[in-house]
């Protein structure tokens, strides 16, 4: 989602692969996977971001998600 990152592509891809493997291991359908990932994002924001910044972070995350979907739609 982000255009630039302090994390290597390899590190991001490794984490993504491991998370996909967990979802596949549990045969999670798309709606369950999205529910779990959404709950994970909510938990990360609520436990790792200062209360005053949570709404801004959530909005920024949502905008980045929407932008990445639009970008993927244009590619297809």
Swiss-Prot record:
InterPro entries: UPF0352, YejL_sf. Pfam families: DUF1414. Disulfide bonds: none annotated. Transmembrane segments: none annotated. Coiled coil: none annotated. It comes from the Bacteria. Belongs to the UPF0352 family. This is UPF0352 protein PC1_1633.
